[in-house]
Amino acid sequence: MKSVAVIRAGPAGIAAAKALAEQGLQAVVFDGKSHLGGMWQDAQAAPQGPAWEGMRTNLSKHNCCFSDHSHPSDMQDFPTVPEMGKYLSWLCTTLRFGKKYQALN
C-alpha cells in the first residue's frame, strides 16, 4: 500500500486522510500539536489556541460535517468549539481509515 504524507490534523487534514483512504492509499498525518482537530478543541486541550470561549462555527452543523458522518441530531445548529472537537475526534475513531497520526514535538 502506498503512503501519502498529510500535514496538519485539522478538518482539512482529516478530510484529506479520509479521501486518500477511499482511494486505497494510507495517509500518515503529521501535526505539531498533540491533539486532532486543529483549532477545534476546547481551551483545556489547546489553551493557546486561536478559538475563544463561546466561539461557534459560522456554518450550520449540516454544512460543516462529512456527508456520510453527520453531527448528532441533538447538537445545536451552530456547534461550539468543544462540540466540533468532539465531532472530529469521534470521526477519527469511528472511521478507522488506516491513518497514522504523529505529533511532531
Model-based region annotation:
Residues 101-105:
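A conserved short coil-to-beta-strand element within the FAD-binding core of flavoproteins
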Residues 25, 32-90:
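Glycine-rich active-site loop/strand segments that organize a redox cofactor
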Residues 2-29:
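N-terminal Rossmann-like FAD-binding beta1-loop-alpha1 element of flavoenzymes
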